[in-house]
From Swiss-Prot:
Family the UniProt entry places it in: Belongs to the universal ribosomal protein uL11 family.
Cited HAMAP family: Ribosomal_uL11
Gene Ontology CC: cytosolic large ribosomal subunit
Sorted UniProt keywords: Methylation, Ribonucleoprotein, Ribosomal protein, RNA-binding, rRNA-binding
GO biological process entries: translation
Physiological role: Forms part of the ribosomal stalk which helps the ribosome interact with GTP-bound translation factors.
Binding partners and assembly: Part of the ribosomal stalk of the 50S ribosomal subunit. Interacts with L10 and the large rRNA to form the base of the stalk. L10 forms an elongated spine to which L12 dimers bind in a sequential fashion forming a multimeric L10(L12)X complex.
Annotated protein name in UniProt: Large ribosomal subunit protein uL11
PTM note: One or more lysine residues are methylated.
GO molecular function: large ribosomal subunit rRNA binding; structural constituent of ribosome
Signal peptide feature range: none
Length: 143
């Protein structure tokens, strides 16, 4: 069994799917740890090509020998809610100004998609988490 590599740093980048380039924010974030930036960009773009148009977070682990691994997460709940509601962005004052609405069915669909990344035991709890995010963005939740 090969010896384990020593983990130096773990961080998350939210990047457009299939469009990672060595320009900021990718270049500086990886460059300061001595990681091969082009290698990351090529593998990230290849793995996220099918999700173009979404923001896909990547959790990157950098090791002592300057190698790296990354795990793709699901798109942020806020992005999925904006897409479901069909609005440009959330409200600046969500408790006073509502910018759109989402249905319970849409919430459940988003919760199913996000379930792996949420700290929830079942789908109902995940749906409540997503509903809270929707309310904090100025979206009404309708039945």
């Amino acid at each position: 069994m090969p010896p384990k590599k020593k983990l130096v740093k773990t961080f998350t980048l939210q990047l457009p799917a299939g469009q990672a380039t060595p320009a900021p924010p990718v270049g500086p974030a990886l460059g300061q740890h001595g990681v091969n930036i082009m290698e990351f960009c090529k593998s990230y773009n290849a793995q996220t090509e099918s999700q173009r148009g979404d923001i896909v977070p990547a959790e990157i682990s950098v090791y002592e020998d300057r190698t790296f691994t990354f795990v793709l997460k699901t798109p942020p709940a806020a992005r999925l809610l904006i897409k479901a509601a069909g609005v440009a962005k959330g409200s600046g004052v969500p408790h006073m100004e509502k910018v759109g609405q989402v249905s319970r069915a849409q919430l459940r669909e988003i919760a199913e998609k996000k379930m792996a990344d949420l700290n929830a035991n079942d789908l109902d709890q995940a749906e409540k988490i997503i509903a809270g995010t929707a309310r904090s963005m100025g979206l009404n939740v309708v039945d």
